[in-house]
């Protein structure tokens, strides 16, 4: 199920698409924080690839919510290149996993304050909690 809060008769397709992108970015932020908790360290930069990286709105929102830079991989072959890099490193033919990989392409820096990012994520988490509560109540 999905919900959209704050819809009115003036809400158009652009606002709905933006809401979906913001929801994706917020969920990724939750996952990154969970990974940081499991790793016991802070992620300093998020490197991304794939079709959704074509959305500058999503990438900027991601940087804003995480409060870290988001770097786009410059090749559409990121997965294959990553596998090759791991194989080279595993065969001791490279000194690091990243050796020989292209430098990141575009970089998005956070453009909102940490306090604003926290408020947006808290609003997202409250909305998710309301949806989860309504689902647990049954039909």
Predicted features, each with a name:
Residues 1-139:
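Glycine/Thr-rich phosphate-binding loops that ligate phosphate moieties of nucleotide
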């Amino acid at each position: 199920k999905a919900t959209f809060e704050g819809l009115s008769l003036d809400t158009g397709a652009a606002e709905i698409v933006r809401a979906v992108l913001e929801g994706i970015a917020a969920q990724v932020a939750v996952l990154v924080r969970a990974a940081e908790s499991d790793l016991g360290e802070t992620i300093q930069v998020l490197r991304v690839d794939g079709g959704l990286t074509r959305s500058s709105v999503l990438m900027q929102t991601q940087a804003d919510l995480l409060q870290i830079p988001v770097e786009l991989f410059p090749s559409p072959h990121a997965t294959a290149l990553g596998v090759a890099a791991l194989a080279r490193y595993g065969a001791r033919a490279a000194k690091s996993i990243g050796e020989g990989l292209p430098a990141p392409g575009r970089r998005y820096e956070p453009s909102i304050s940490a306090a604003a990012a926290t408020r947006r994520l808290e609003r997202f988490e409250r909305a998710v909690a309301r949806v989860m509560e309504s689902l647990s109540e049954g039909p």
